[in-house]
């Protein structure tokens, strides 16, 4: 006679449950990717697991308004609001890209009350790599 195998729950259900319970995150890394068209703010723990993220597009900005400093400020405040509730006190900031939202996002992060260990610019710079596209003629 075979024993019935108990189903504890699928892997997917367990993952959702672990995401819902707000585990305490004292320290994290805030990644700001600022392009000319959009600004994406991702908050991870020190191991690199994504805790929260937001972008100007998810905050309701559409078209050219996504690249504005105000949209970046709103996206940063939106991403940080959830991790402050989970107890984040210290963070490192990595800023990537040439966009207008760089400074506005950093200002919003400073205003949130999280202590910043350091702010690092991680924009990739080529050591004369690929040939750039030809200049636009308007």
From Swiss-Prot:
Protein's UniProt keywords contain RNA-binding: yes
Give the family, as the similarity comment puts it: Belongs to the universal ribosomal protein uS11 family.
In this chain, composition skew of type Basic residues spans: 9-21
Which Gene Ontology cellular component terms are annotated?
Answer: chloroplast; ribonucleoprotein complex; ribosome
The protein's name is Small ribosomal subunit protein uS11c
SUPFAM superfamilies, alphabetized: Translational machinery components
Q: Give the UniProt record's GO annotations in the biological process aspect.
A: translation
Is the Lipid biosynthesis keyword given for this protein?
Answer: no
Q: Which UniProt keywords apply?
A: Chloroplast, Plastid, Ribonucleoprotein, Ribosomal protein, RNA-binding, rRNA-binding
Give GO MF terms, alphabetically.
Answer: rRNA binding; structural constituent of ribosome
User: The organism sits in which domain of life?
Assistant: Eukaryota
Where are the stretches annotated Disordered? 1-21
Cellular compartments annotated: Plastid, Chloroplast
Gene that encodes it: rps11
Q: Name one Pfam family in it.
A: Ribosomal_S11
UniProt subunit comment? Part of the 30S ribosomal subunit.
| Record field: transmembrane | none
Taxonomic source organism: Ceratophyllum demersum
Which InterPro entries did the record assign? Ribosomal_uS11 (IPR001971), Ribosomal_uS11_bac-type (IPR019981), Ribosomal_uS11_CS (IPR018102), Ribosomal_uS11_sf (IPR036967)
Q: What does the organism's lineage look like at the top?
A: Eukaryota, Viridiplantae, Streptophyta, Embryophyta, Tracheophyta
């Amino acid at each position: 006679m075979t024993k019935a195998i108990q189903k504890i729950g699928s892997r997917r259900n367990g993952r959702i449950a672990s995401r819902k319970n707000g585990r305490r995150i004292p320290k994290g890394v805030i990644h700001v990717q600022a392009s000319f068209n959009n600004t994406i703010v991702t908050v991870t723990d020190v191991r690199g697991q994504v805790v929260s993220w937001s972008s100007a597009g998810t905050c309701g900005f559409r078209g050219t308004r996504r690249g504005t400093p105000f949209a970046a400020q709103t996206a940063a405040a939106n991403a940080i609001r959830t991790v402050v509730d989970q107890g984040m006190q210290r963070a490192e900031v990595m800023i990537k890209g040439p966009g207008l939202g760089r400074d506005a996002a950093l200002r919003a992060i400073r205003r949130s009350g999280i202590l910043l260990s350091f702010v690092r610019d991680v924009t990739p710079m080529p050591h004369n790599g690929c040939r750039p596209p030809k200049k636009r003629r308007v």
